Amino acid sequence: MPIRPLQFFAALGIAWPSAVAAGVVINEIHYDADPKTAAVEFVELHNTGDRTEHLGGWYFSNGIDFTFAANTTLKPGGYLVVAENPAKLGAEFRTPKQFVLGPYIGRLSNGETLTLRNAAGEQLDRVNYDSGFPWPTAASGAGSSMELIHPSLDNDLGGSWRSAGMLIEPSEPVVLLAAGRSG
């Protein structure tokens, strides 16, 4: 008997996504580089919507200190990386410069709350991650980042994330399960 998507989500303790929510989400976090002095921490944003988002004045109010420049946009389906040190990130992971912003002030911890706000101060997304289970443990000191399994999942839940590979660059979204299907 094949396992249906709903059964798979239930086994993982993840709520089934009803539909892809439009908007910009915190999609990937690299918070514990190996070695610790590498200065290649980053937060990746993904635009899940069908229109270009103008990020001018948007900012992180928790975790890191970074405000997006007035002319910053993110196309539908696009990605942006906010890096601790853009030059070091680019050298380490061959990340294309046009997708990397920064530097930000602060350091990501082994447990942090990241809050993304628009220019009016409204909360757009929030992730309160940790370095232990149910969060991906390979992201804690092993050099990996953690990435959202599907952009419509609640990214404030550890079960919605997985450890990423070592090549870190904006690419096709990680979609392990299609949204909008029922079992």
Where are these regions (language model features)?
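Bacterial N-terminal signal peptides
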Residues: 7-18
